[in-house]
Amino acid sequence: MKLNELYNNIGAKKNKKRIARGIGSGKGKTGGRGIKGQKSRSGVAIKGFEGGQTPMIKRLPKRGFNCISTKKYNIINIYNIEEALADGRLSADDTITKEKLVEAGVVNNKNNKKLVKLLSICSDDFTSPLSLKLDAYSAKAKDLIEKAGGKLL
């Protein structure tokens, strides 16, 4: 047996029905779409319509809401700032602001829409005296920065 001699078994592959190709084809004239109406026209799909049964979107309960006044924070840790200082992306002499963190690549903040909050996870031995001007700080982060001789503006 050779590759060019391979073929399907009889009846294994059925040719698809070509619609709207004349009355003799069995699917001619209206092409299985019925007569007139929205669904007989081209390019129409009624989104969410399930043929008269209650659609899925109505069967499921409404849940939750989006609070308008919720503040969305970009969260960074003290060790992220330490890494940027060690790499030379940030300077310890300058006041560290949200804009400088974005420039250094510590925070991904498009159009400065989100606020920046500083946490102190895994950072118990912070010693750099920094001056920071961010939107929010955790209580532990405040203590660590003030113990190291830093300022929160």
From Swiss-Prot:
Part of the 50S ribosomal subunit. Belongs to the universal ribosomal protein uL15 family. Keywords: Ribonucleoprotein, Ribosomal protein, RNA-binding, rRNA-binding. InterPro entries: Ribosomal_uL15 (IPR030878), Ribosomal_uL15/eL18 (IPR021131), Ribosomal_uL15/eL18_sf (IPR036227), Ribosomal_uL15_bac-type (IPR005749). The gene is rplO. The keyword Ribonucleoprotein applies. One of its GO terms (biological process) is translation. Binds to the 23S rRNA. Residues 21-41 are annotated as: Disordered. Residues 23-35 have a biased composition (Gly residues). The keyword rRNA-binding applies. It comes from Rickettsia massiliae (strain Mtu5). One of its GO terms (cellular component) is large ribosomal subunit. This is Large ribosomal subunit protein uL15. GO terms for molecular function: rRNA binding; structural constituent of ribosome.
